[in-house]
Amino acid sequence: GQGEYTFPNGLKYVGEFKDGKEHGQGILTSPDGNKYEGEFKDDKRHGQGTFTFSGGNEYEGEFKDGKEHGQGIFTSPNGDKYEGEYKDGERNGQGTYTFGKGEWEGDKYVGEYKDGEEHGQGTYTWSNGEKYKGEWKDGKEHGQGTYTYPDGRKYVGEWKDGKRHGKGTY
């Protein structure tokens, strides 16, 4: 049925219940301003929903067992946007991250993620036109890759921890 419950810690749930648990459509708000609106299963965020953080960040997409899991879109007030796959609350699988205002404004990464970091095959394009296409490990260029400059010059070779390393050609 429908109901409303306020927890001793200040969390407030308004929505559907089943067997005394949050289950179905509902809204969960916290005293610090976080808000989740969407599907619940057995007292956990599960299915489609939107989580809005008190600082303005927002995740809209799939949840499983209380965590971001499946396809989702993350946005922040400065314009950062990630659209892609999540697993156990982290960016995992294929995704696109576009940077908003700040140090990396206009930069974009398209590729694979593991545990929230760029990992696997991916392409990073800087706002000045420079581009790296190749292998990534733990958020850094690592393995075989091609770095292209705006004027067309290229470096093709090996990378380690974000730096040119080993054999390569210009």
Could you tell me what each predicted segment is?
Residues Y5-T6, L28-T29, F51-T52, F74-T75, ...:
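Hydrophobic face of amphipathic alpha-helices that form TPR/SEL1-like repeat modules
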Residues P8, K18, K41, T52-S54, ...:
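Compositionally biased, low-structure terminal segments
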Residues K12-H23, K35-H46, E58-H69, K81-N92, ...:
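Conserved anchor residues at repeat-unit boundaries in beta-strand-based tandem repeats, strongest
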